[in-house]
């Protein structure tokens, strides 16, 4: 019963997140576009130009975060497909580095393995693994991908791993 409730809660959270991201993205496009047009009308070096340039840069950064989160949420609807775990790990690193402050920490991947799994499940597992590793990180977090006994394994520096059934060759 508790698993069913948790599943419904997560599904509701996903729907709300998708809707919120959409509602944020639309006015953000107008904000960034208006700032870009205004920059062309202002003299460089003026306070007004600098303020509008800051608005444009900040809006662009927020738009990148929104796009990354939208992509992550969209993955949740995909069924199983053939995936490179290294590519999925790189995508997870891209998302985490956009939305979580990771100052002084380098995120890297090494190795590769292929799995057949829903990309949303793989992405969620890898983001969770990264977040756990970042809690104790001191310098570098590496996601090492390898095949081990019929499984594709992703190991995080400092502990933690996720296992997926390796795809048949």
Feature names for model-found ranges:
Residues 1-23, 32:
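Conserved HAMP-HisKA connector
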Residues 29, 33, 40, 46-169:
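Core catalytic ATP-binding domain of two-component histidine kinases
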């Amino acid at each position: 019963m508790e698993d069913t409730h948790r599943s419904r809660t997560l599904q509701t959270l996903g729907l709300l997140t998708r809707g919120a991201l959409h509602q944020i993205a639309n006015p953000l496009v107008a904000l960034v576009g208006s700032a870009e047009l205004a920059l062309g009308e202002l003299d460089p070096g003026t306070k007004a130009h600098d303020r509008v340039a800051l608005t444009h840069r900040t809006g662009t950064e927020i738009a990148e975060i929104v796009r990354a989160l939208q992509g992550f949420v969209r993955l949740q609807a995909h069924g199983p497909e053939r995936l490179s775990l290294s590519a999925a790990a790189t995508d997870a690193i891209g998302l985490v580095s956009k939305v979580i402050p990771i100052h002084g920490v380098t995120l890297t991947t090494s190795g590769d393995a292929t799995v057949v799994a829903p990309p949303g499940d793989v992405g969620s597992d890898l983001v969770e693994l990264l977040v756990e590793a970042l809690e104790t990180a001191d310098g570098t977090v590496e996601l090492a991908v390898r095949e081990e006994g019929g499984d594709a394994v992703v190991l995080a520096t400092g502990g933690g791993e996720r296992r997926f059934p390796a795809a048949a060759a």
